[in-house]
Amino acid sequence: MMVLKVCLLLVFLAGVTTARMDLNHLIGSNHHDSSDEPSESSEPCCDICVCTASIPPICQCTDVRLNSCHSACKSCMCTRSMPGKCRCLDTTDYCYKSCKSSGEDDD
């Protein structure tokens, strides 16, 4: 009976570790250091956009933002951490303009 409990504990820990590793992929270093200001989080823009070679293309923004997705996002997924790290799961047939081009004018 003790062996069964130890095996179940090991399976549980392996599952938790795997889930945490997937979360680390989501909250990697490619995120915007944005604040809670609505103007910044609501502007639809994307720095890392991936598209298929199909016609029409299927594009998805892989940027990770803090606390919220832009206002045009219909399916936003966030971590439960503080601050939350969010990624828009929408697919479109185009890429939004780059976020970096709008933020670099503040130098």
Curated annotation (Swiss-Prot):
Gene3D superfamilies, per database record: Cysteine Protease (Bromelain) Inhibitor, subunit H
Site feature Reactive bond for elastase, where: A53, S54
Site (described: Reactive bond for trypsin): R80, S81
Domain of life: Eukaryota
Keywords of the record: Disulfide bond, Protease inhibitor, Serine protease inhibitor, Signal
One annotated GO molecular function: serine-type endopeptidase inhibitor activity
GO cellular component: extracellular region
Disulfide bridge partners, by residue number: C45-C99, C46-C61, C49-C95, C51-C59, C69-C76, C73-C88, C78-C86
Pfam families for this protein: Bowman-Birk_leg
InterPro entries: Bowman-Birk_prot_inh, Prot_inh_BBI
Signal peptide bounds: 1-19
Keyword match Membrane: no
Post-translational modification comment from the UniProt entry: The N-terminus of Bowman-Birk type proteinase inhibitor 2 long is blocked.
Note: Two forms of the inhibitor were isolated. The shorter form is probably derived by proteolytic degradation.
Family: Belongs to the Bowman-Birk serine protease inhibitor family.
Function: This protein inhibits elastase and trypsin simultaneously and independently.
Name of protein: Bowman-Birk type proteinase inhibitor 2
Source species of the chain: Phaseolus vulgaris
